[in-house]
Structures are given as structure tokens and as C-alpha cells.
């Protein structure tokens, strides 16, 4: 009877909605007024509180119109904007149809003397250690954790040691070759072993099964013992020098200039590990680390593949072991190995490298070892979190002199070309390799704990804020094909992404956000939260990326993770990565799922912050108190109980941004907080807590929309080079609390174009199912016949983003300050500035007599497309007012935006560069299935096509695949 009544009410709601639209419009927006230090672009909020005509309110995203590089450089120029200058920045609340570009807002900016406020270098709070917090119950969290641990202990530890023994001349008998990106013919080898060590350590801290902990402990000990055995082979006394042979002695400049990087060369290099230098520990000879000093390019066959990236993974693994295992001897040995390798890095970079940032690039590269150039190279200069690990080492170990060397080494990984603009709040993120740069920022922030230099804190804070406002998708991820695109262009980037399935036709490719980026953004967010634990924006984002992309990135049916995450239209998660060495995301993936609780609680001497709501038991050893949080996950209500101990402290509970209605806190049955401000913390002041004290939190999930900042107006067609034009429309995702909701059965953008009521009354929340394990507490909602489930639970052919037709209130009026009937060309102006800048870069390179670097700033085909669209757009920009309609202006702006966002750096191949390869592949597929050589060539060619489509392939890979196919087709 109850079910029939619910259906009747639902049917009646639909009938009423069809008869009359319940309009809701923005009635009020909080004022935006900021002070900015002279020489910096303003820090503008990425979200503002709006109040609607029905009295309700929420945070909405803002797109500010100062994001072009030229505009930001002007804002940060003290000659143009000296102290005392006041100016305005225009923007729009996205997803609103009051005007074509959204609801207009204005920020008042005042330029002042001084600097931004910077916290003390000692964080206000630290997360409770992983070993002191356990996840409880039978839910998706514990299911994923146990799946990960079981996979981890099934992996042969000797396989992880193969490359080390091979590199140091030890017998490899009984040690199976590694595979994936740690294979003997992959120069990133060692990265997977580093992730493996981190995962062992984190799993050890999280594991609830003593038998499994014993296996983890045994494997950790074997890794540490054998790595130290390898490292000790580099302890070589040199009588002539009167000291040990060190990193600075390895490869003198004359030798370095002649050093080659082919596989035959590396076979030679590994024959004498005594030359590597005291303390060198890596799965590949030391030549790999020093070739980057000659600015050798990313090329697995002939040169390098991110030398210091793999070093970082191994350092991080050793540090994680040292800080998580309960065996003191093993912990000390792991830390000693890491310290000795950290000092090798210091020795090499201190004595053999330098920084020169002025002059032309050929001048900057005239001598080996200019770190300005080294760390600014695509992938070859990818260093992971070297700075973070070295900074952590300086905190954990060493004499005063060694600590100073380690923090100096950490800051040797500063990238001035990237850091300097960020420190001024100028967006240096655009077009960079995403996962190359996120951990560099985390490292800078970690070094701030020791050096106290505001430069490092500022650049980290500015970077994080830019990500939130300009680059993130609804699930919390970033990037497309491993790259950051233009700011505020997520929808265009998503809708124009294409790939080849092995033939010559191009197809939409809805796999975008690299999982490594989610892992590293979560880590950066956790670090920032420690300095400002009362600012709920950090843990709001952490909850978003954890609840969606991270938890959704492991296959609950069998252990597999994803590289690029499924985002957009009719997207399927590309499962794979069954080992830490499979790819970079196989490595971060095996860590992700054994540490969900690492940021659940932050503490200091007198306060605990409850940052995440999940079923956990927290042992606050400093206070002698055990707190048990009892809830389902995802949680709309939770109970925190003092299970053991007593103590005096305050408790702060996060009010999520989405908790706009009904958030209530009770202490021992008495209401202590209600009508709380979203995106804040509620404090229960310092009191004497005792066993069985109970805090109850009610936080009903609300329905809301998460819009992309740009409208959807074009998508690739299935014929090569074709595209389909659409009327510009805001595109967004349905949200249920922190969860992105997705549905199946949507095949194209026409089907993904939907009507949505302004007050969201046609979105019906259905609550949660029962279930256990991976399917426990599964929420759903419905909208016009489609049932939506959380993104983390969807696998195949799911759609997250929809073109949403939300009627604007015809009676709504803008405030007088924002009312305007003029044609808005602001976005077209910003795009033309980008096109102008890129054209100038390309022409400057063309004019060089000696091409340094050897490739142009922008790849040929994409550059030509941009110039063609810019030529079409410029006349509309120059035309008198009224000659062109807003629709015509927006159309050319959209086409130019699409052209800009599909450009690639000049060192990367484009899809057009695979024409011959794809033709050969089609022919090769006609050969007999029993031709093993052909099958290997076909498999490799398919992999290359995927890599190039994703943006991570290289011309040498295309050439190698082409040659292999030609050989089998003879």
C-alpha cells in the first residue's frame, strides 16, 4: 500500500510539473571584495553563496573572466597595477540562464602593500596515523580494502627484486622478470616496486587480519634486506680521493656530454655498479639519472623516461615502510636506505647542477645541469614527489648537517618556470602534463614545514584554488590525455576527445581523468588541510574525489584498477592494471584502496576534527581515547561514541558544502547545533569527555547540480574529422550529497539533452538500498524515467554529464550594476588573446636559426586549426556593436575554444601522424592468427595508438610500431 501511494505522489508531481514550471532564480549573491598584494593576480573565490527567490541557498561555482595568461600577467605587473590601484573583475555564476554566459557577478580588487597571510610552518593539526584508524563494517570501503590486500599478498615479492639484482650484478636465478612498466626494457622500472613497498606498508597499517599482516611483514623485510644488499655495493673507497666515491664523481662533464641512452648502452652500464656513487639505490643504472642533465628527451628506446620519477617512488616506499611497520630493525634499515639515496641525490644536484633562468633556451642549455630546463621538460623532467620525500627524510632522520642537505636537495627540485608564476597567482597550469606537476606542488608545500618560506605555501595554495575553480570535473579528477587543458574548458575538452579503435575512423573517447592525478590531489589537499583545518573547502574536495573517482577506480568483481577514469557520455571504465608495475596508475591504484581513512580525523593538543564521515574506530593515543564512529557508508547520519578512555578536548565536525538543509548535532541527546553554515565546522567546545558520551550528526543528502564552466556545443562525429554542432547549453552532473550520480542507456548527446526543473523538483531521491559488501547502502535517484546510481558503482556505458535545459525565470531582474543589453564579447576576447600568444610563440621558434628545443611549441595540425578559427573569429571581435548577434559571437568563440583545447605541444604526435600506422595495422589484421610475430606487432601497434590518442605516445613509438608492421607484411 505504501509503495502504491509513493508512485501516485510521484505521478502527480510529474503532472503538476508539466502544467506549470516552478521557477527559481538567483535573488542575491554574496559580495566579492578582495585585497591582493602588489605584484600578484587576485585570489578570487571559486564558489559563492547564492540565495534563491524561494529563500533557499547553496554554493555555486563562478567563472572569472581574467583567466587568460595575458590578463593575469597584467594584473600581476606592479607597473600597471601599483599599490592603491582598484579594479574590477567580471565573472559569471555558471549553469544559470539569466544571461547567455550565466548570472553576472563582479569582484572588487584592491592592490595593497605586503603579502598574503601565511600560517606558521608547523601545521595546526595532523591526521591521525593510518595505524590508529580502522574502517569497520561490511561495506564498499572494507570490500575494496580487502580486495586490494588480497591482491597485494598474492604478488611474488621476488619479481619486485629482479631489476635491482640485474642492475647490481647479482644472480637473478629464481627471480621472475618483472613486467608492465617495470619490464627489463622499460626505463621507468623501479616505479612499480616503489609503489609496491608503499602499498605493503599502508596495507600493513590498515589490515585487520593478523595472518595477512604476517605475510605483509615478511615481504617488507625481504624487500628491505635485499635493497640494502644492493646499495652496499656502491660503498666504494677511493684511495686517490681519500673518501668514498660519490655521486658528484660519477660521469664527469666530458663523459656526460658523450653519454648515450640506448638499451645496448644500458646493458653496458649495469656491469659496474661500483661507479654509481655512494648510496645509489635504483632499479636502473645511475646513467639514467644523469642523462637528464644533458636535457635528453622522453624516449624509452634512445634516451630516458622520467628518471627521478621512479627514484621518488622507491624513496616513498622506503619511508612508508619506516613509518608504518612495527618491526623497529626493519624500519630503521628502510630509513637508512632512503637517507643514503637521498644524500646521493643531494651530492649530485649540489655539485653538478645549477639554476639559470635568463636568456634564450639555447643559452640556458649551453652547459649541462641547468635545473630550470631539466624540470621543465615534458615527462623526462617528471620528478614525482622527490621534494616531498626528501623533505620528509629531513624531518625523520640524520645529523643536523644531513638534515640541511636533505632539505636543500628537496628544493633542488623547484621548477621556477612553473613555481614563480604560481606564487604570484598566475595560472601556469594550462597545457602542462598534469601528474608531472601536481606532486611537485605537494613537495613544495612539504618543504615549507622546514624552510618556512612563504613562497612555497603561496604557490601550493594558489595551485589548489585554481584546480577547484578552473580544472576539476564533478568526480574531482582533472586532465585529458594526461594533460591540463585551458582553464574553464572541461566540457569542451571532454566533448572533443577522440581516439581510434585500431582503424582510421575516430570515435568519441570518454576516458579522461588520470587516476594518479586524483591520488596526488588528495595528498596535496590533506597537506593543506593541516595548516587550515577549520577551512572545510579542503575536506569537501577530499570527500568529493575520494567518494567518486578514487573509490570508483577499482573493480569490485576482481582486482583491477583504471588508468584514465570514465567521464562523460556512455563511458565504460577501462579496467586493467592488476599489478603495481602495470602502469603509473597501477602503482597509485594499489595504494589508494588501503588508506581511505588516512584523512578521516585531524588532531592537535586539544582538538579533534572529524573531517570524513565513515564507519571507523579511531585510537587517539595522545589522549588515551578511542572514538568509534558508527554509520553506514555513504553516511547521512552518524554517531560518534567515546568507546574507551576519557579526556579534555574540543570536537569539530565538518558541515559539508552540500548539507544545505537539516544538518543537526546532538551531544548526549541534546541539540547543540542546527541551521549550520555549509562548508564550515561546528565546534563542541573543550569539555571533559568520558566513556559512552555520544555525538549524533544528521546531515541529509541534498540534490544539486555540478556544472562544467563552459557550454557544450560541439562533439565529434563518427566519420573522420567530422563533428556535430549543438545549440550551446550548460552541461552538468546530478549530485546526491557528495556523490556524482550516473545512468545507463544514453547513447548520444541528443539523448543526453534533458529538461530539468529550475527548483530540481523533477529529481526524485530514492534513498539507499540494503545490500552488503560492494553493493552496501547504494543510493539511487530518478529523473524522467532514468534511474541514477553513484558513479563509484557504475562500470559500463554510464553517462555522468547531461546537457541541461533549465528554464530561466522570465520575470527575474538583474541588479542594476549587472544589467546590460550589450553584446558580450569577453570570452571571445580571452580566447583570441590565447591564440595570439600561441601564434607569437610559434613564430618565434620558426625564426630560430638553431632550433632549441628541436620541436615547435605547438604541433602542426592543431596549430593550423587554431589559426583558421582565429581568422574567422577576429572580424567578429573587431566589428561594430550590433553587427553580429550574441549567438553568432558565441558560435565562433566555441569553435575557437575547441580548436585551442585540441592542440598538443610540438613534441607530441597528433592523430594525423598515425595515418600510415593505421593503414598498416588494418592490413596486418588480415594475417593468420597463428603468426605470433604479427600478433606481437599488432598488439604493440594497438597500444601505441591508444597512447598517442591519450596524449602520452611519442613519435619514436609510432616509428617503431610502423617498422614492426612493415616487417611482418613483407
Model-derived segments and spans:
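C-terminal beta-rich recognition modules with glycine/proline-rich loops and embedded aromatic residues
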Residues: 460, 539-548, 553-641, 677, ...
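Hydrophobic, small-residue-rich alpha-helical packing segments that form membrane-like cores
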Residues: 336-439, 446-450
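Solvent-exposed beta-strand/loop surfaces of large extracellular or lumenal domains
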Residues: 660-685, 705-713
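Extended, well-ordered alpha-helical scaffold segments
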Residues: 136-137, 144, 211-230, 327-348, ...
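Positively charged n-region of N-terminal signal peptides that target proteins for export
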Residues: 1-4
